[in-house]
Amino acid sequence: MHRKIASWGLGLVALAVCGADWLQFRGTNGASAAQDAAPPDSWDGETDFAWRADLPGKSVASPIVVKGRVIVTSSSGVNQDRLHVLAYDVETGKQIWSRQFWATGRTLTHPFSAVAAPTPTSDGNRIFAFSSSNDL
């Protein structure tokens, strides 16, 4: 099952404009604020996006932005035992790379959640993606 990622929130749109990294859940220092951002006054989720991408499986994790790349995670398979980490160009939405791993722990989740629930994080050089199956 593919999920369309049309918008990851006004903060991510603002980040694409100002070019800043967003390395963790809720951004720098967990403040949920982008410095010098100018988000739009109105938002139409059907047409107001720069690009969209198909993800393998499903995800409820927030994306992060590292060096011009949007990093997102997802999980797929009947038991959500296939874990994915994907990178897209922040400007064009073109997929740059993807990695797949097999879950080694328990993959049971609520029907509205996903094994790829935790938001990835970065130190600016490396990506750390944790899953609810306790895989890092």
Predicted regions and their residues:
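N-terminal secretory signal peptides that target proteins for export/translocation
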Residues: 1-3
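Bacterial N-terminal signal peptides
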Residues: 7-16
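Noncatalytic, solvent-exposed loop/strand surfaces
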Residues: 19-136
